[in-house]
Structure formats: structure tokens, C-alpha cells
């Protein structure tokens, strides 16, 4: 399996993540994906061919293997890593949408040169507002996926230990047969390692949610004690709802003032223009 594309996407999200989120990404790609690609796939590469039962009955080996190993460990871990990494793409799409809006605002303000647009693409987006909710939801989904997969793994393989010998009575085996698992010690070591890495990721996800909530509460308390100035600058200020509403009100007041000046200079224009002016004022 090629993990390069997934790594490229998550690396873009990593630029806008918290410090805990960057540690989580390192654990994902160093301690889980690298181990899965380099070592685990080779250890489980011959699991079906090396699963031997002491019988010559056709089909007995395959049936017993499917009974004791319904899902391969490697495929289960691969599916887990893909689903755990998918919520981070929500943050990537949200950041891309926010940067698109910033570029549109710059073009409307007359700053649509390539230098300013490239600066929007390079600068780090702060986790606040709707992006904060998107980021928290993505972390919560990561946490849920990790917990669900650990529970499913426990249901499939209780005890997390790879046994050396299993006894199979499934049809078409003629009687109870002994089946031998290849490399049980190596598989047990890698299983414990991958589950420990998954547990570390769960702890990091919980810590990141707590960190985001504490930082949001601290930011809100700071805003209450020190109200922000209306003359703020920067891309984030241009995108704030207060700034947009102030700009709209300013444009409406300028249009209303211009219309009243025209009426004062031209008193004979009639009641039609005055009525239009009153309607604009009511708006």
C-alpha cells in the first residue's frame, strides 16, 4: 500500500495544527505506518500459507484459518489508519475554503497581485471561530475511530496474544484437528506495539481536545477583559462578521448621504426622489 498521498495531505494540515496535533502526526507516521510498512507486512506476509493443520482433508486449512483469523491484522490496521486520518481532511478543506475567501476579499480590495495571494496561501490560519469547531470535531472523530477499532480488535482476538496452536472442529474437517500458527512470538510483539501506539494516539487526542477547550475559554475571558479595537488589521479581521457588517453599514450610509446631497442641490426633482430617499433610510 502506498501511503505517500495520505502523508502529503496530512502534512498540509499539520501546518495549521496545534503542537499536540503535530506530535500525533509523528506517532501516526513513524510508530505506526512505518512499522506497518517495513516490518508488520513482512511478518504477516505468509500467514495463510504457513497456517498448517495436521489433516489432508481438502479445504480444512482454509476454513480453520478463516475461523480463527477472520480479518488479517495488517488489513485491519491499514483500515484503521485510513479512517483515523480521514477526519483531518475536514480541517484541510475548511482551511482551503477560508483561504479562498481571503483571496476573494483581497481582490475586492484591490490587492489581487500574486504576491499578496501567495502570502495568503503561506500564512498559518489560527484555530478560531468555525475552524475551531471543525478542528475539535475532527479530533473527536479520530478518538472515536481509535476506540472503536481497539474494541473490534479485542472482539476478534481476545487477549491480544497470538497463540501457537489452535484446535479446529469446523466443517469439512473430519474431526478436531491441530493447526499451527507461524511466527506467533513476532506477531504478538507487533500486535502489542501497534495497540500501544493506538493507545498513545487516544491519549494525545484527549489531551488536544482539552487543550483546545482551555485555550478557547482563555481567549474568551481575555476578550471580555480587553475588548478588541475596531481598527484591527490582518486577514482574520477582514473576515470577521463584525468587520463585514461595519463595511456594509458604511457603504449604506455613504449611499444615503450622497442621495440626500443630490436632493438638496436639486429641490425641483419632485417627491419621487424624496420617497426613494426615505425608503433607503428605512432600509
From Swiss-Prot:
Protein name stated in the entry: Gap junction beta-1 protein
Record's subcellular location: Cell membrane; Cell junction, Gap junction
Major location (coarse): membrane
Chain positions found as Phosphoserine: 233, 258, 266, 277
One Pfam family named in its UniProt record: Connexin
Keywords of this entry: Cell junction, Cell membrane, Gap junction, Membrane, Phosphoprotein, Transmembrane, Transmembrane helix
Domain of life according to the entry: Eukaryota
Amino acid at each position: 500500500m502506498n501511503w505517500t498521498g495520505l502523508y502529503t495531505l496530512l502534512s498540509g494540515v499539520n501546518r495549521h495544527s496545534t503542537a499536540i496535533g503535530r506530535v500525533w502526526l509523528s506517532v501516526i507516521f513513524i510508530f505506526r505506518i512505518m512499522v506497518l510498512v517495513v516490518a508488520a507486512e513482512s511478518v504477516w506476509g505468509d500467514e495463510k500459507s504457513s497456517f498448517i493443520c495436521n489433516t489432508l482433508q481438502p479445504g480444512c486449512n482454509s476454513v480453520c484459518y478463516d475461523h480463527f483469523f477472520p480479518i488479517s491484522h495488517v488489513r485491519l490496521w491499514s483500515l484503521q489508519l485510513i479512517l483515523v486520518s480521514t477526519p483531518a481532511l475536514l480541517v484541510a478543506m475548511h482551511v482551503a475554503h477560508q483561504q479562498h475567501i481571503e483571496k476573494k476579499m483581497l481582490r475586492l480590495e484591490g490587492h489581487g497581485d500574486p504576491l499578496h495571494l501567495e502570502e495568503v496561501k503561506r500564512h498559518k490560519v489560527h484555530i478560531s471561530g468555525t475552524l475551531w469547531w471543525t478542528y475539535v470535531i475532527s479530533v473527536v472523530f479520530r478518538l472515536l475511530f481509535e476506540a472503536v477499532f481497539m474494541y473490534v480488535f479485542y472482539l476478534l482476538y481476545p487477549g491480544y496474544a497470538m497463540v501457537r496452536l489452535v484446535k479446529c472442529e469446523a466443517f469439512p474437517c473430519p474431526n478436531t484437528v491441530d493447526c499451527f500458527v507461524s511466527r506467533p512470538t513476532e506477531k504478538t510483539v507487533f500486535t502489542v506495539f501497534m495497540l500501544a501506539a493506538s493507545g498513545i494516539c487516544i491519549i494525545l487526542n484527549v489531551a488536544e481536545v482539552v487543550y483546545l477547550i482551555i485555550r478557547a475559554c482563555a481567549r474568551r475571558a481575555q476578550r471580555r477583559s480587553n475588548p478588541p479595537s475596531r481598527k484591527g488589521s490582518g486577514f482574520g479581521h477582514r473576515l470577521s462578521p463584525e468587520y463585514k457588517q461595519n463595511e456594509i453599514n458604511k457603504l449604506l450610509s455613504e449611499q444615503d448621504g450622497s442621495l440626500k446631497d443630490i436632493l438638496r442641490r436639486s429641490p425641483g426633482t419632485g417627491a419621487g426622489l424624496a420617497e426613494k430617499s426615505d425608503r433607503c433610510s428605512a432600509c
